[in-house]
Swiss-Prot record:
The keyword Ribosomal protein applies. One of the primary rRNA binding proteins, it binds directly to 16S rRNA where it nucleates assembly of the body of the 30S subunit. One of its GO terms (cellular component) is small ribosomal subunit. Residues 22-43 are annotated as: Disordered. Residues 90-152 form the S4 RNA-binding domain. This is Small ribosomal subunit protein uS4. GO terms for biological process: ribosomal small subunit biogenesis; translation.
Length: 202
């Protein structure tokens, strides 16, 4: 599965709110399409698959990337689901989004890919870069970069910055103070179902 570039609201109506993908919320209680209102009991597999798709669309990763994250989380020990969410949340594109520097993860990824973001004073253009405690995330010293972020700060995707991050709006400088806590993950997700999905695929 490649990265999704189609209508975002259609995905939100099918999977529920995806704060990383779009600020729009599902207005209808049933999925899109001609038979959207016909509610059928879903299989356990369908439920696990849906949870996995939430992660894919919210964080903007492809199937292959997510599988790599799952394998890495397994090797790390502890709760695989918790570590999986930490790996996704600590990506540079998501960190830029959670700092309020971009309204969505796709727009944060664009900022990173185009070289507008620095980590410890050096431009990092890899969206999947894993941010670490103590690192400083800031905007490149160019007027265009600063204006883009200043505009984005007026329309943040989420109201609150997580407790493991801090951001100085005047200096446009953020800092990673630790690893994200589970309670600060904005996406409504059951990560255990995703771990189960991949354990059954193995």
């Amino acid at each position: 599965m490649s990265r999704y570039r189609g209508p975002r609201l259609r995905i939100v109506r099918r999977l529920g709110d995806l704060p990383g993908l779009t600020r729009k919320s599902a207005r209808r209680a049933y999925p899109p399409g001609q038979h959207g209102q016909n509610r059928r009991k879903r299989s356990e597999y369908a439920i696990r698959l849906e949870e996995k798709q939430k992660l894919l669309y919210n964080y903007g990763v492809c199937e292959r990337q997510l599988l790599r994250y799952v394998k890495k989380a397994r090797r790390a020990g502890g709760s695989t689901g918790k570590v999986l969410l930490e790996l996704l949340e600590m990506r540079l594109d998501n960190t830029v989004f959670r700092l309020g520097m971009a309204p969505t993860i796709p727009s944060a990824r664009q900022l990173v890919n185009h070289g507008h973001v620095t980590v410890n004073g050096k431009v990092v253009s890899i969206a999947s870069y894993q941010c670490k405690p103590g690192e400083v995330i800031s905007v490149k010293e160019k007027e265009k970069s600063k204006e883009m972020v200043k505009t984005n700060l007026q329309y943040p995707g989420l109201a609150n910055i997580p407790s493991h991050l801090e951001f100085d709006k005047n200096k446009l400088v953020g800092k990673v103070n630790g690893i994200v806590e589970r309670e600060w993950v904005a996406l409504q997700i059951n990560e255990l179902l995703i771990v189960e999905y991949y354990s059954r695929q193995a």
